[in-house]
């Protein structure tokens, strides 16, 4: 059970790779927020994806019950006989979902979980040290829960990158991942534009994806009048993954798509202000973190 967000879901993939190598033939069914349901399908160790819509259901609980959607979700959880349920999120909302599966439940103990009360829902409560990167914490959780030795070295996301790369490859380009959720995570538009201009002087094309009207407007402002900057059409997650996989490099703020770039082994410079890259930064090969040197950073606000 790892329902959200985009970055958190991507962080769980190396743990699945570890488990699949340690226990040949193991498969995972994954409970995930409906908007991110495509991501688990990219990993070969995932059998079935069970979408959940907590974000949408909260807006109209009565309609969720009346429509039968909640009943069908519970039925899907009970449709299979599992050896173990692993709450990889450590939140009350994820722990609550484990109640509907008829199998032993494992998760983080009260000193390890983000929400300590979540541990009350588990039969097996496992200790995983805080103060380390989220990917490594998840790798340790899976290893302890499933009883294998944690592999040494950098985790492997297990994605088939070659399947996503567009062939034949067009001319090289750099992707700007400028959209993020918190206002404090944004990089000033004037800096984005200056960087695009400098890349233009070196003959490098810049592409800008977007996911909502505000991001589209920002992308258009950054690209305005620059011959080397291209605002992409709106893409779904798989479309963005294809564009990322074919990119020569990427510049990103702290955003879920930045973690996807890392998972696809795209050389990326990630910019961090209020968050701590040591705990939740882009994890992978050729990843560079530039963090704010403000005295208050990382304030997590």
Model-derived regions, located:
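Catalytic machinery of carbohydrate-active enzymes
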Residues: 1-301
